[in-house]
Amino acid sequence: QRMESWLHKQVAKDVANSQHSRKTTLELGAGTLNQLKYEPAFHPYDIVEPFTDLYKNSPLLERVRNIYSDCSAVPSGSRYDRITSVATLEHVCNLPEVVARSGLLLAENGVFRASIPSEGTLFWALGWKMTTGLEFRLKHGLDYGLLMKHEHVNTAREIEEVLEYFFEEVRCKVFGLTKSISLYRYYECRNPVVARCSEFSNEKNP
């Protein structure tokens, strides 16, 4: 839990200062709304989350302005200062479409902020096998790796390649020593390549 909090804190770092806490936000894959614990309580916050059971009983739901079941459902005229995701991009089957649409939904000087596990690296595999994987096998007698193969459809490298295709500026920070020797990564993306985003999402940017 303590290590996983790194994922949340990196994404929320830009609004830690009250001067920037009014930024409009769209969170992709908001799940149980646990990222809201790290976010200011009074800035406009929209979410994309297809599974209503994850958040419907959350006491944090009152802080959410708009809820969308899919990124494509967000009105094309909407603009956000920040679009965020925490341990979500590795699960997204249509990742290029989602990132392209996000690029079009960013306001001028907006930032796409995403934290992910270092999926696809030996260090990450060893990490979960010795913790969650071991616990899962002892409790259920099943191989957690099979579940991971179905859940994590994108590696960290694949995610980075998609981000670099749709954004001119992509910065990466790791929870570890290097990209290959890390448990988690945080990406900060600026200046979307609008032509590529529009072409891939079949949407013209107004």
Describe the function of each predicted region:
Residues 10-124, 186-192:
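Conserved SAM-binding loop
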Residues 2-5, 72, 93-107, 111-200:
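S-adenosyl-L-methionine-dependent methyltransferase catalytic module, highlighting the catalytic core
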